[in-house]
């Protein structure tokens, strides 16, 4: 394929590139990161991009922002094969794969209205990460879908 058959996306000066996101999941990644386009963050999203390794993938570039470990942990739940590239001065300075944590604490809220974490108790939420979802450490509710909607905004 000749170079004029590729759409070129400009490099970012500094920020994060999230690569190898499962095809069709980029918008969920943006939701997890709390980015809705209303901020000043310059964001580039590529969806269903051809990939040798995954056949199709999504990619997200965020100018001027490096992800926290909590954000990477939640991201790993929907994109376990993602790669996080930290860009500084237009070059990849750090490159790492996401690791699914054993526990996610204080990031997600339990959907069970009877859970102690859903009430106004001073209890930090905690979820055990399973192969097919997550389990609340308090009420044992299993969550496997719509994880972005459970992100605690606080």
UniProtKB/Swiss-Prot annotation:
Keyword Metal-binding included in the entry's annotation: yes
Cofactor(s) listed in the protein's UniProt record: Zn(2+)
Residues annotated as binding Zn(2+): 110, 115, 136, 139
Protein name (Swiss-Prot/TrEMBL): Aspartate carbamoyltransferase regulatory chain
One GO BP annotation of this record: pyrimidine nucleotide biosynthetic process
GO cellular component: aspartate carbamoyltransferase complex
Keywords: Metal-binding, Plasmid, Pyrimidine biosynthesis, Zinc
PANTHER family tied to this protein: ASPARTATE CARBAMOYLTRANSFERASE REGULATORY CHAIN
Listed Pfam families: PyrI, PyrI_C
GO molecular function, one term: metal ion binding
Family affiliation: Belongs to the PyrI family.
Subunit field text: Contains catalytic and regulatory chains.
Gene source species: Halobacterium salinarum (strain ATCC 700922 / JCM 11081 / NRC-1) (Halobacterium halobium)
